[in-house]
């Protein structure tokens, strides 16, 4: 999925003219850097990659919390095809056949009468899916801390905050191998092909069946997030980029 497929904002026409003339462009991932080079005809030496940061204390596992072995969690703007929620819903349908108690928490909302609501009805998973909206960061943290597996089934992410938020809360993560996601995860999560609910459901089964092993990897994943995306490091990188430019 290239950046060009989603050039729906009119201001991007102006950016195509301006971007090649800029001395330094800062972007949050190697994937987005590649897209800028291809779509805006910019020189690679004029683009600096600085990750977005995360408050890893706000997104941290709650001590003493118990993870529900039947609870999956995802963050998605329902009815937005890019977020790939359809494939998480279809995977849930597959898993429900063997485990009627499995359920998916979706941090987000859906449009009344929209595509997502219709798909949920078609798949007969209404009792297995719960949408949560207008949550505080502490409430999001609580949901992550009581979930066993986090899903990111996006088709494109310039920078996937749901990826690093879940990892910071030590939730074993399964995510699609697209755009920026692999560089965020490193070796601390499971990558799957996009648009493949069968592969997704199979990986969920594997994680739940070997949970202690994936839990250990998730603990290491949190340390990776702390080391890579802490605001002190990000701020220092911005300072260097700014001073280099001026």
Predicted features along the sequence, with ranges:
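Nucleotide-activated donor-binding/catalytic signature segment of Leloir-type glycosyltransferases, i.e.
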Residues: 116-138
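Short hydrophobic beta-strand element within catalytic cores of glycosyltransferases
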Residues: 172-175
């Amino acid at each position: 999925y290239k950046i060009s497929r989603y050039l729906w904002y009119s201001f991007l026409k102006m950016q195509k003219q301006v971007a090649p003339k800029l001395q330094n462009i800062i972007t949050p991932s190697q994937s987005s850097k590649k897209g800028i080079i291809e779509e805006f005809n910019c020189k690679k030496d004029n683009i600096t990659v600085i990750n977005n940061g995360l408050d890893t204390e706000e997104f941290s596992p709650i001590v003493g919390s118990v993870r529900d072995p039947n609870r999956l969690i995802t963050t998605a703007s329902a009815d937005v095809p890019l977020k790939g929620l359809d494939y998480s819903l279809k995977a849930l349908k597959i898993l429900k056949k063997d485990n009627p108690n499995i359920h998916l928490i979706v941090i987000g909302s859906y449009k009344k009468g929209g595509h997502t609501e219709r798909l949920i009805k078609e798949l007969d998973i209404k009792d297995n899916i719960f949408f949560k909206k207008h949550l505080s960061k502490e409430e999001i943290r609580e949901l992550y801390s009581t979930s066993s597996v986090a899903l990111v089934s996006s088709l494109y992410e310039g920078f996937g905050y749901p990826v690093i938020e879940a990892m910071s809360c030590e939730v074993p993560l399964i995510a699609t191998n697209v755009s920026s996601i692999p560089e965020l995860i490193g070796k601390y999560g499971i990558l799957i092909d996009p648009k493949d609910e069968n592969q997704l459901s199979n990986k969920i089964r594997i994680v739940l069946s070997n949970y202690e092993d994936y839990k250990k990897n998730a603990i290491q994943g949190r340390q990776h997030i702390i080391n890579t995306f802490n605001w002190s490091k990000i701020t220092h990188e911005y300072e260097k980029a700014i001073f280099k430019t001026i």
